[in-house]
Amino acid sequence: MAESNKMKEMPVNKLMVQMGIPMILSMALQAVYNIVDSAFVGNMRSGSEAALNALTLVFPVQMLMVAVGIGTGVEKNALLARTLGQGNSKKAAKVAGNSLFLGAIIYIVCLLFGIFGVKAYISSQTVDPQVISMGTNYLRICCVISFGIIFFSLFEKLLQATGRSLYSTIGQVVGAVVNIILDPIMIYGIGPVPEMGVKGAAYATVIGQVVSAILLFVFHMKLNREFEHDTKYMKPDGGIIREIYAIGLPAIIAQALMSIMVYVMNLILKFSPSAQTAYGLFYKVQQFVLFLAFGLRDAITPIIAFSYGMHSKKRIKDGIRYGLLYTIVLMVIGVAITEIFPGEFAALFNAGASREYFIGAMRIISISFIFAGINVAYQGIYQALDGGMESLVISLLRQLIIILPLAGIFSFFVRGGHIGVSLIWWAFPITEVTACIVGYLFLKRINKNKVESLN
């Protein structure tokens, strides 16, 4: 079946599985980059505790780079899918070209931060000179060579918007394999390659990302024939850029809020470096689980957006129903794994002094995964139906308005010696349940105003 006919005619439940599985694998493999780095770094011969803490502190900026790339891609994904659903191939070409122009701007910003801002950022979270040195070296490499992850994210969404998510997954798998092969070689030093420690982990990561980006560029040029490829479409078009960000600026802010939340949590936990490291390690496991929901969201959004563009009320409703159902199934599996095997994850990272904090965080915070996954699915639905502001509100509730004040208040009692660090972890389930209730109310309103009103 042709790609355009598939988006129009294939039963939504089958289409979501066919598109969703490659996207889920792709997102999961993005999380693998950070897990693999931490696992190898945690088993270094010396300085592993400081190195793990350093990776925890740099993680918010890594997330922010991914967030801006993916956020720009998600908004362009919805707009491109809707435009193709309307049969407007010329506008689709402009959307694709302008997204690449925006990618170049994003890279320049990351490059400048990598050169001038990294050390000050790391120093704001710790006073340990070894951690500052390791974190600065790692993050500078990731920022200066960030064009790989930025353009991978953009080409990934271009392929997903046309229903070719399998090819984006192939590129991600190749990059992940390169990263996994290079990590022990460059961290520990094997053969002619010298031991580079944390720097080696950074180089392995960015090389894998660059390989993925190159491969997806080739796939995009060869396979995406629904619209023209020409550098003339990269010329900035104010109307297209405004339309992209009218849909997706809330999505970028939502993604960036994840980085802000982790950074502020690092500051809240600054009183205990072991708890700080434990949270950073757990967040990478949590990200792996929630990236399953993000991957499915990236199938939900173009399917519903395409259906919205062709005014198919039935396919929109099917997209909402199956999107939520499949998300819940994935999150139940994630909760089961993290609740049953916390000790095994701690051993993978060689968590050391952070072990008990890590296990405690995993057992408590993983309770929230089901509600967090539903919230992610809600946001994909909102974005497909021009509900960018609703998506932003859910993100603000989850990652700023509720979670940070709660964690800060709970930390006051922990620092006073009244109760253990586990109290802080309970802020996460409370936040996700509250946001899920609000998200359901938003969904009912959008369904009434956007879906039921279609002719």
Predicted regions mapped to residue ranges:
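Transmembrane helical elements of multi-pass membrane transporters/channels
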Residues: 18-37, 141, 175, 208-212, ...
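Short alpha-helical transmembrane segments in multi-pass integral membrane proteins
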Residues: 1-20, 80-147, 193-248, 304-368, ...
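Transmembrane alpha-helix boundary and packing residues in multipass membrane permease domains
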Residues: 23, 27, 39, 78, ...
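N-terminal transmembrane alpha-helices
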Residues: 7-47, 60-75, 79, 104-111, ...
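Short runs within selected transmembrane alpha-helices of multi-pass transporters and secretion channels
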Residues: 70-73, 142-160, 168-176, 201-216, ...
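Small-residue hotspots at the loop-to-helix junctions and early N-terminal turns
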Residues: 49-60, 135, 139, 273-288, ...
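Helix-terminus/linker motif at the lipid-water interface of multi-pass membrane proteins
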Residues: 28, 32-53, 122-129, 185-196, ...
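Small-residue-rich hydrophobic transmembrane alpha-helices
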Residues: 52-112, 149-168, 278-342, 372-386, ...
